[in-house]
């Protein structure tokens, strides 16, 4: 809870020891009497979307194919970052914000999986789906409209689960993992032929310089090697990026050597 201070006239003011707590014209009353059906309710915040109404197969996919891969990959990356941050104040300062941002959704995924398990959400969803199926079966028109809903949902989620897991591993390891990939994608986005020298200078100033301000190449080299390794272990061979063929052939599958060579030539 934050207390907002204002000037003597109850208007915004610079700091002064004479400032007083702001007095609003209206306040939202808080009742301790509980609530009744049809009482007014509101959500504080701005949720852009919700997964509250996911079916049981959707919840299962979120747990197994989204959260678990994210927890694993970010855990590996953050452990590498943390070791370097503990060993160097310079690295700690550079990576403090990055670490906090990465661990935020990492903790979210861990907490979500624990909560879904503790509350037996999948079992509850299945009970709701069974009740829905029973309701549909009681009426011919309902069967005509909704008869295939659950089958289609099950088929849609189960048939896409493997690809969702692959997508999560690749995205977490490369788009959100090794920072050098982000740098490469940033540079690729520049339309060199269609840009003036001044526009390129502005791009370099606004993006590239700020990137290197809080970047440690030797640390990112370790992350790249670790990300390459975990993807190779978790993603089926037929779904691996083509670069893995080069690494296997030229570097004998040694991702640390590959990463060292990449950074040596970058």
Residue spans for each PLM region:
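Terminal presequence/propeptide segments associated with secretion/organelle targeting
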Residues: 1-266
């Amino acid at each position: 809870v934050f207390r907002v201070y204002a000037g003597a006239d109850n208007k915004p003011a610079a700091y002064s020891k004479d400032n007083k707590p702001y007095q609003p014209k209206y306040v939202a009353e808080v009742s301790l009497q509980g609530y009744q059906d049809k009482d007014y309710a509101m959500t504080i915040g701005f949720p852009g979307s919700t997964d509250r109404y996911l079916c049981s197969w959707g919840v299962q996919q979120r747990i197994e194919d989204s959260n678990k891969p994210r927890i694993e990959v970010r855990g590996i990356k953050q452990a590498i970052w943390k070791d370097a941050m503990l060993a160097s104040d310079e690295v700690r300062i550079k990576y403090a914000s990055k670490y906090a941002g990465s661990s935020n959704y990492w903790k979210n995924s861990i907490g979500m999986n624990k909560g879904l398990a503790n509350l037996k959400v999948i079992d509850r969803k299945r009970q709701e789906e069974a009740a829905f199926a029973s309701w549909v079966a009681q009426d011919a028109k309902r069967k005509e409209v909704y008869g295939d809903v659950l089958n289609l949902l099950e088929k849609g989620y189960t048939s896409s689960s493997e690809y969702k897991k692959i997508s999560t591993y690749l995205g977490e390891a490369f788009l959100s993992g090794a920072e050098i990939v982000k740098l490469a994608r940033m540079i690729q986005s520049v339309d060199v032929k269609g840009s003036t020298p001044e526009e390129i200078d502005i791009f370099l100033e606004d993006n590239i310089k700020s990137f290197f301000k809080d970047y440690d190449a030797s640390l990112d080299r370790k992350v790249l090697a670790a990300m390459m390794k975990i993807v190779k272990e978790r993603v089926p061979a037929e779904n691996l990026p083509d670069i893995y063929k080069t690494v296997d052939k030229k570097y004998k599958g040694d991702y640390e050597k590959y990463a060292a060579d990449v950074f040596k030539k970058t």
